[in-house]
UniProtKB/Swiss-Prot annotation:
Assembly with partners or alone: Part of the 50S ribosomal subunit. Contacts protein L29, and trigger factor when it is bound to the ribosome.
Sorted UniProt keywords: Ribonucleoprotein, Ribosomal protein, RNA-binding, rRNA-binding
Function comment: One of the early assembly proteins it binds 23S rRNA. One of the proteins that surrounds the polypeptide exit tunnel on the outside of the ribosome. Forms the main docking site for trigger factor binding to the ribosome.
Molecular function per GO: rRNA binding; structural constituent of ribosome
GO terms (BP aspect): translation
Protein family according to the UniProt entry: Belongs to the universal ribosomal protein uL23 family.
Taxonomy, superkingdom: Bacteria
Pfam families, sorted: Ribosomal_L23 (PF00276)
Name of protein: Large ribosomal subunit protein uL23
Disulphide linkage map: none
GO (cellular component) term, any one: ribonucleoprotein complex
C-alpha cells in the first residue's frame, strides 16, 4: 500500500501542450509532470485517488533538460518525468472545476 503522503508528492502538475491537448481529445489520455523517482504504480494510484477516476494504463518517459544560454554563460534546465495516463472509457478529469 502506498502512503497518502507519497501520493500527494507524485503528481506535480498537468502538462499542457499542443500534443497533450490532441491526445486528451482523441485518446482520453491526460499528461502529467510527475516526480522523477515516481513509478507507474504510484502514478496510477495517485491519479485514481486524487481525481476519483479509473485508470487504464500509464506510460512514463524521462525528459532531458534543455541547454540554455545567457550571453557567454551556458546553463541547463533540470531533467523531469512525464506520464501519459489513459483513463477508462466514460471517465474524465475536469481541471477547471465546477464553475457555475
Amino acid at each position: 500500500m502506498i502512503r497518502e503522503e507519497r501520493l500527494l508528492k507524485v503528481l506535480k502538475a498537468p502538462h499542457i501542450s499542443e500534443k497533450s491537448t490532441m491526445v486528451a481529445e482523441k485518446q482520453n489520455t491526460i499528461v502529467f509532470k510527475v516526480a522523477v523517482d515516481a513509478t507507474k504504480a504510484e502514478v496510477k494510484a495517485a491519479v485514481a485517488k486524487l481525481f476519483e477516476v479509473e485508470v487504464e494504463t500509464v506510460r512514463t518517459l524521462n525528459m532531458k533538460g534543455k541547454t540554455k544560454r545567457a550571453g557567454a554563460r551556458v546553463g541547463r534546465r533540470s531533467d523531469w518525468k512525464k506520464a501519459y495516463v489513459t483513463l477508462k472509457a466514460g471517465q474524465d478529469i475536469d481541471f477547471m472545476g465546477a464553475a457555475e
